[in-house]
């Protein structure tokens, strides 16, 4: 059922109400004979659970939304059959994305709209899986000089 396979495919989709364009690169997209596509993302670390994908790790879900909006121009496909994380550690693992279980594009649009409001402050730890686990960006954000119970302070420059 495989028609063609494409690696490192760039795509983009624009939120019509804000003009914001989301750009992303899919690790692999397989186009099937029935006109649908399978999207794959390779991971060397732990694969996200369904709950993590719905709340924190929306990469594949957003790539699927880009594809459904015609954002992968070179593929000419508008329907996603499946989106899957592939773990490439010591043993092969698969984790399917929960397509259709969440209003991903609507929620993404709402998030972007909120940050386009000049009165909305930015926070370094907006949606942490576990607050007590260090983030790759904690040092950059100077975490430790402030706490997670503090609201971001808007400083106009």
Identify the residue ranges that each predicted region occupies.
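RecB-family 4Fe-4S metal-dependent nuclease core
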Residues: 1-157
């Amino acid at each position: 059922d495989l028609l063609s396979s494409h690696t490192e495919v760039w795509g983009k989709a624009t939120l019509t109400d804000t003009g914001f364009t989301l750009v992303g690169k899919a690790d692999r997209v397989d186009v099937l004979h029935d006109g649908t596509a399978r999207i794959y993302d390779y991971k060397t670390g732990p694969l996200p659970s369904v709950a993590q994908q719905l709340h924190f790790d929306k990469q594949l879900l957003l790539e699927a939304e880009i594809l459904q909006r015609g954002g992968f121009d070179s593929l000419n496909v508008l329907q996603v059959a499946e989106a899957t994380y592939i773990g490439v550690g010591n043993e092969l693992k698969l984790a399917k994305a929960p397509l259709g279980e969440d209003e991903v594009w609507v929620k993404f649009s709402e998030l972007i709209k909120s940050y386009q409001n000049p009165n909305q402050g930015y926070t370094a730890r907006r949606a942490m899986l576990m607050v007590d686990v260090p983030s790759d960006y904690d040092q950059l954000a100077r975490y430790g000089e402030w706490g997670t119970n503090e609201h971001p302070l808007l400083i106009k420059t």
